[in-house]
Swiss-Prot record:
Any one Gene Ontology BP term: translational initiation
Record-stated family: Belongs to the eIF-3 subunit F family.
Pfam families tied to this protein: JAB, MitMem_reg
Keyword set, alphabetical order: Cytoplasm, Initiation factor, Protein biosynthesis
Species assigned in the record: Yarrowia lipolytica (strain CLIB 122 / E 150) (Yeast)
Domain of life where this protein originates: Eukaryota
Record protein name field: Eukaryotic translation initiation factor 3 subunit F
One GO location term (cellular component): eukaryotic 43S preinitiation complex
PANTHER family in the record: EUKARYOTIC TRANSLATION INITIATION FACTOR 3 SUBUNIT F (PTHR10540:SF6), EUKARYOTIC TRANSLATION INITIATION FACTOR 3 SUBUNIT F-RELATED (PTHR10540)
Gene Ontology MF, one: translation initiation factor activity
Domain MPN: 20-163
SMART domains hit by this protein: JAB_MPN
Location, primary (coarse class): cytoplasm
Length: 294
């Protein structure tokens, strides 16, 4: 029989994180869990895994997985065996990641929240973070909120679950360009009645990327022209100018002829990769057909 934890309703952590970075992948996993919940469940909870900075002031949430639970007005039941089992499986693929906190798809903070937070803090002895995403109406803009807990009372060890949740700053980021491309493809499917899209080729992706770059350059050019003409003069304009100058100093200076040569070389590499991929695909298909004949 699996071991369970039953929580009955009851009435500044030093070294706690002050900033949380949430990857888009982890946020997507949380939303996927919310969409797959049972109809009678008002919210779902789960474990956040990632890495901590050396001083513990910053936490990066890289992945998340669901933890089964049931909740009523008087008690909450959590499967204690499920969490370590899932963590062991997760660390086979990501050995450097540790439990950094937990999440809930509800912004409500109550006594149960304090007790669950205390459980996650005791797992490895480091201050846990709590992330909430209001997933009741997914049509609204999603705004993740992150908290740390500050114990209340003279002796916190005797008042388990009595704490105050203190908001801390957070940001959502993409791990790499592959994450952004995948999420943009998924997001574009919502415009289709079938909720599906056809993946474009490498050349089409390259064309779309160049079009986006040209659009951004046109916006920057228009903004700079407004600043020069005096239509836009503010502290924000100075900050934008400094960022543009910093970006230009980091960009290697290339004339149009060299830039065209480099672009053509890159285009040839892309075409060669596409050609080789199609060749290997054809060879594998032919080999499979010959194998069935033999």
């Amino acid at each position: 029989m699996s071991e369970t934890l039953q929580i009955s309703r009851v009435a500044g952590t030093n070294g706690a994180p002050t900033h949380v970075t949430v990857t888009a992948q982890a946020l997507f996993q949380i939303l996927d869990h919310a969409l797959r919940r049972e109809e009678e469940q008002s919210k779902v909870i789960g474990t956040l895994v990632g890495i901590r900075s050396e001083d513990g002031s910053e936490v990066e949430v890289r992945n998340a997985y669901a933890v089964p639970h049931s909740e009523s007005e008087q008690e909450m039941t959590i499967d204690l065996e499920y969490n370590p089992t899932m963590l062991a499986l997760h660390r086979k693929a990501f050995p450097k990641e540790v439990i950094v906190g937990w999440y809930a798809t509800s912004s409500e903070l109550n006594t149960f929240s304090g007790l669950i937070h205390d459980y996650y803090t005791q797992l490895d002895g480091t201050p846990a973070i709590h992330l909430t995403v209001e997933a009741a109406n997914l049509a609204d803009t999603l705004l993740p909120r992150t908290y740390v807990a500050s114990a209340v009372g003279i002796d916190p060890s005797k008042n388990s679950g009595n704490c105050v949740f203190v908001p801390i700053s957070n940001e959502v980021k993409f791990n790499d360009s592959a994450d952004r491309a995948a999420l943009e493809a998924i997001s574009s499917a919502r415009e289709s009645p079938e909720r599906s899209i056809n993946l474009t080729s490498d050349l089409a992706n390259l064309e779309n990327s160049l079009t986006q770059v040209l659009d951004m350059l046109e916006r920057v050019q228009t903004y700079v022209a407004r600043v020069i003409s005096g239509e836009e003069s503010s502290e924000k304009a100075q900050q934008v100018g400094k960022q543009l100058l910093s970006t230009l100093t980091l960009t290697p200076s290339l004339d149009a002829q060299n830039l065209e040569a480099l672009f053509n070389s890159h285009l040839q590499d892309v075409l060669m990769v596409v050609y080789l991929a199609n060749t290997v695909k054809t060879q594998l298909q032919l080999s499979a057909k010959l194998t069935t004949l033999v």
